[in-house]
Amino acid sequence: LHPRVRRQRQMCIRDRYNAVYEAAEEDIMQDYVDGKVCAYTLVPGLQAFLQRTFPGARIRCHQSVLVKRLCDRVVDMPRVYIDIRKGWADFVVFDGTKLLMAVSHEWRAQEDIRYHLFNLLDVYDIDPKGVHVSLSGMRDEKNALMQALRGDVAYVMKTLVPGIASKTGMSLVASLLMRSEKA
């Protein structure tokens, strides 16, 4: 893209971001995955610090990593990936290879994760009996949620991750990054 067009696009994304969240222009970071943009902030001033301290370092949002690495997994039905972290669950929703949504929601109880899953299915008019749900993350929560969802969704299973991740308890994002670096 021409530098002027790129700058205009970045400003539009920053304006949209600031319509929901408050952040200084220089703190809003952007990742691009297959024509989609992920806008995010971390800590005020962090982006400038990282650019000064680690010039050329690639900084990515964990949601961007999930979208990029999971979009090519072929399933004949809509699919939802849920990565359960302490206090947060990441949801990535696809219809075929088309990304519908990538979002993180806070949770305190398993019912919160179920609520967010079924809310996403409702928003995108996806029949629970016609969806594939893949779970990863915290072992106990993942196993309990898998049992709870068995009667409600067509397919529910653990997300297949590289062997080292399952043996070491490595996060899904870290294991997907390792896999991509080896490829």
Whereabouts are the PLM-identified features?
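Single conserved hydrophobic/aromatic residue that forms the stacking wall/gate
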Residues: 1-13
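Accessory, usually C-terminal, subdomains that scaffold auxiliary metal cofactors
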Residues: 7, 31, 39, 100, ...
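Small-residue (GG/TT-enriched) beta-loop-alpha framework at ligand/catalytic clefts
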Residues: 8, 27-126
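A charged helix-plus-loop insertion that forms the helical arch/lid used to bind
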Residues: 10, 14-25
